[in-house]
Amino acid sequence: MKRFYMINYLLCGICLLWMTGCSNMLDEMRPKDKIPQDALSESDLTKLLNGVYAEMEELVFKFYMDGDVKGENFKAGPGFSMNDPMSMAPSSKDVLGQWQKCFTALKQVNFLVETYEASSNKDSQVVKQTGGTGYYFRALIYYHLVTRGGGAPILRKRTYDVVPISPEADVWNFIKEDLGKAESLLPEFTDRFYVSLSVCDALNAKVCLALKDYTNAAIYADRVITKSNFALSTTSAEYANAFISNSNSKELIFALANKRSTGLLLFYQSVNDIDPTWDYSPSADCYSHLYADTSVKKQDIRAKAVFGADNSRIIKFPNGSTGQFVTNEQPSQTPIVVAREAEMYLIKAEALGATNGLSTLKEFMNKRYATVSLPSSMSDTEFQNQILDERHRE
């Protein structure tokens, strides 16, 4: 019996030594389904891109109605209350959620960027698309951050370190740097549901306008406007078509497809649900006056596509039921629009100013109204007010 215990103790000791000796090896072992970053094939990169697109869907969706909420276009919908819609306090649930989502998505996007930068096959079109998409998405994330919070921590790589907040000017420079890199890698537009050079130009136009670089804002916007791939909607039905599943609208420069089997992102659930409870309804002023005729423009084509007879609903995102302006075959797959042609016209007009931009504004408005009678000249204030009103209507 004593011998039996001695043998057991000896075996246990050997096992302990073996486990200790192999601990470093075990620590370095990857999960069986995980591929080292430097061993990713082009097929792997395509799958990785799909995952990042899904992550960005969640991020853009989280910000999508932020402007309407804070701009008081909305009031509380049935079964919902809005305590302080304009709160920007760090403790705010919405603000905190947006901030956290930005950095969750950034981790995935930085993996794309790191993969491109470490690649030994940078001439591959798939690798270029990976890098260009990563740089564009990173610029888009930081655009959301800087336009709401100013300074932000700049993360060029994934890290768990505490990174201090950089000044706002540095964040803008980082965005411009990433867009410059994306511009050299992205292909021309072929599909509205994939990142292209055109959507990079669109974000560049927005950035330049925000920084009051009006010359380049107009140049970038015009690059998009002059592409035959894009066109302004001229009827209510065409306008509505941009916001339904499988959209073929030429207004769309880039949209996230939102074809998910789990974790559905439902626009109609927020403003136009089938059940009698949803988050937001149009404010009384918004519903009654947003698309009202004025002395210089009448019969806005957007009105029918956005509001119906029920003043508590916004039918811009059709729910697939009755009372909608257009049919939406898959309401759960409404695209998450990132950039549209309309904004490029308004950016170009604003950047050119009242004297040189009036013709661009007229061209835009002629597509949106049955009747337009703008004067031959406008003061800077009058012109800016028209731009602001059109942005509000969009």
Predicted feature residues:
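Short, surface-exposed recognition loops and adjoining beta-strand edges that mediate ligand/DNA contacts
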Residues: 35-36, 62-77, 152, 188-269, ...
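Bacterial Sec-dependent N-terminal signal peptides
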Residues: 1-31
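Conserved, well-structured interaction surfaces
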Residues: 46, 79-148, 161-167, 184-187, ...
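Inward-facing hydrophobic residues that define packing positions of alpha-helical scaffold repeats
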Residues: 49, 106-109, 172, 179, ...
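Elongated scaffold/linker segments in the mid-to-C-terminal portions of large proteins
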Residues: 93, 229-356, 360
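Acidic, glycine-rich segments characteristic of secretory precursors and extracytoplasmic regions
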Residues: 22-65
